[in-house]
């Protein structure tokens, strides 16, 4: 007579993962509350003399084209086009308009019939309407790129890859739905960024690994490593005398602040350091915690000191690659400006003393310090947690 196999249904899964479900439910409540608190207040504004709308449009015909290749711009196009477009969204949907497309190194490229573009429609109180091409509409190409990324993550990573995509979605919601609106309302930049990053670390590691000993150790290590990156960033910022007011593209934010938006600018540099360090810190802490969990399972007789030493040996192999990754990422993001500064023939002292290069160095090193110091912290926490029962007996 065959034994009846016990089928694992939803109820059994919930019992087995009750702590994971509880943490994620609490995280969802916190996310909703955070979004409600950070949401911008509705203000009744006076009717402006000029209204600007960015709408999608399709090019029907190129009416005139004076673009030509410019050798000075690496054979890029320069000039202007007059286009006939059909508006596909907004109040002017379905209407045809003649719009100018200004082409050059600092603008977009030439457009052709059938291309989709984002156009800027300026409406004035006297009834006048002007429209120009803002940019080539990249929504569909970007959607294809994102779809390929999702497919690669799921095919290669399987269920874990799918979980990581959910964690990424939560991260994006936290950044764009909570952090940025909160900063626009005047929240403390450093405190708010750290809280959101700590939340992202806990939720992401819970989604990927569930609530287990190793994932809890990784969470604690990630939060501690992020805090250390923050502290080192503040120290380096004070020593080098650079702050958020010298960051590239901060001028529009200064203008925004002058119009009454209470955004804090001085913490933006260190806030960016925290965000950039978070991903690498989570990778390292989860790698250390998972490795030590396997080591302990293979040899439960190891002492706390021996398990900690194993974690440090594993972590040392990660330091070089992770440090390179972070510093190269920062230098790569500002590569064009660094190339321009180098072309000026500046001495090494002049180059390193420039505010921009100093900020890139501070950002890369502070992030790397957070990653490096999270290794012994995570190894210490994991060794203590996994050998606690042995120490008590």
Q: Could you tell me what each predicted segment is?
A:
Residues 17, 185, 189, 311-326, ...:
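Loop-to-transmembrane-helix entry motif
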Residues 50-79:
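Structural detector for short beta-strands of small beta-barrel domains
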Residues 103-140:
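Extended, hydrophilic extramembrane loops/domains of integral membrane proteins
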Residues 147-154, 159-255, 263-276:
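Transmembrane alpha-helical segments that form the functional core of multipass membrane systems
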Residues 278-288, 292-338, 345:
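Helical hairpin unit composed of two closely spaced alpha helices linked by a short loop
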Residues 329-331, 335-393:
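Hydrophobic alpha-helical transmembrane segments of membrane transport and translocation systems
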């Amino acid at each position: 007579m065959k034994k009846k196999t016990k089928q694992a249904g939803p109820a059994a899964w919930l019992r087995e993962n009750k702590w994971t479900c509880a943490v994620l439910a609490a995280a969802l409540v916190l996310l909703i509350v955070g979004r409600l608190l950070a949401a911008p207040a509705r203000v009744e504004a006076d009717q402006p003399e000029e209204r600007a709308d960015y709408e999608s449009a399709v090019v029907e015909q190129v009416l005139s084209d004076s673009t030509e290749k410019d050798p000075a711009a690496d054979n890029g196009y320069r000039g202007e086009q007059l286009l006939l477009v059909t508006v596909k969204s907004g109040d002017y949907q379905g209407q045809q308009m003649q719009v100018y497309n200004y082409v050059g190194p600092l603008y977009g490229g030439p457009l052709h019939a059938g291309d989709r573009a984002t156009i800027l429609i300026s409406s004035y109180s006297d009834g006048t309407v002007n429209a120009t091409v803002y940019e080539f509409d990249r929504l569909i190409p970007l959607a294809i790129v994102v779809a390929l990324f999702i497919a690669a993550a799921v095919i290669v990573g399987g269920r874990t890859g799918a979980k990581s995509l959910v964690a990424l979605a939560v991260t994006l919601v936290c950044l764009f739905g909570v952090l940025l609106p909160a900063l626009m309302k005047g929240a403390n930049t450093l405190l708010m960024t750290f809280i959101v990053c700590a939340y992202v670390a806990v939720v992401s590691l819970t989604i990927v690994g569930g609530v287990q000993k190793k994932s809890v150790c990784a969470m604690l290590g990630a939060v501690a490593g992020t805090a250390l990156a923050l502290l080192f960033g503040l120290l380096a910022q004070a020593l080098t005398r650079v702050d958020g007011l010298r960051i590239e593209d901060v001028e529009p934010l200064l203008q925004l602040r002058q119009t009454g938006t209470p955004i804090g600018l001085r913490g933006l540099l260190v806030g960016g350091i925290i965000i950039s360090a978070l991903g690498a810190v989570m990778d390292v802490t989860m790698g250390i915690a998972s490795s030590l969990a396997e080591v302990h399972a293979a040899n439960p007789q190891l002492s706390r000191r021996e398990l900690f030493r194993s974690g440090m040996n594993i972590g040392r192999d990660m330091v070089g690659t992770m440090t390179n990754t972070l510093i190269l990422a920062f230098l790569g993001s500002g590569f064009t400006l660094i190339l321009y500064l180098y072309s000026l023939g500046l001495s090494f002292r002049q180059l390193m003393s420039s505010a921009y290069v100093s900020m890139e160095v501070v950002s890369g090193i502070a992030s790397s310090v957070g990653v490096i110091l999270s290794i012994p912290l995570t190894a210490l926490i994991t060794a203590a947690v996994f050998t606690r029962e042995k120490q008590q007996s």
